[in-house]
């Protein structure tokens, strides 16, 4: 199909009882629960580490730099990790990477408790954590569908997005409370302990078998094969580019929340917990709506509404001096983030065959992981130079250009592509 197709929404089978019926599968229920707790701990630590870094440096540039250093190895490794996830046990990959991340969390806590923590130590451990993230993320996303029957895969994908938003809603709020009453060290230690639960769960679950690529094929050849598969199909190519744009212009706001809390609203750096909690609550309510609506929501509609909401959120942040309105802006950003994540995630997971899924998800995640450090570094550095309000105005304007290009070109329709259109092998 060489001409733009009027795409249709994928019709998915349901086992009855709605998306929550999927929790009858023991392994999915266990992994969902453990991951929710552990990811909540990660967000708790993010609140603590952001506040710690800003208290040590009082510079938005350092916040951006710590994000860049932690995500650059993830960006560089993710495509190769996608090849790995398509040819070896995703379960084993996750067991190893979760262990590494647990060790970095305990090391960070030890340095803080020993009163020898410095910005460079935070960056160094963030780099190690980023290496683990690079190998982990593709395996995680492509592992979740293996915990349920194939016909219930997209229900699992949607609820995996809900799991992350649950963590985002609860983690920052708990992090703020733990930091206030127990200190930064308590938040970091809590996160370290939660990894034990995930590692134990990964030992006992039994994923279904799936098609894997031949190990005889070289890593570079496998990577190029996956890249061609994604590039030759415009809906998949568009998903990666939109993930990059949403991360650069929208999601990066999470990583400069400490600076915005102090510079825009004159709160302490720990005020980032309130902003991030509002973001998480927005994402949580958005996910509940998404689960109830299921397949009735068109992916193209979700994406367009998401970008419009991001622009509204950033514009409100640039204009208001009220911390409460700042929380409203982050709430709107949370709604936007969830809708974009579900739209793009289900597009790829629902149309790409198993033998390509690890690599397909790696390129999608590459867009996310590349956009966050670019956005956070640029926003943080520009904020230090020209002020955060002007920086946010420029950010909203850039995202508006993306929305305009998507609408004028008509490419937004490609987001509703069906598995049959993707499997044809011709550009849509």
For the regions a language model picked out, list residue spans one by one.
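Alpha-helical transmembrane-bundle signature of multi-pass membrane transport and export proteins
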Residues: 1-428
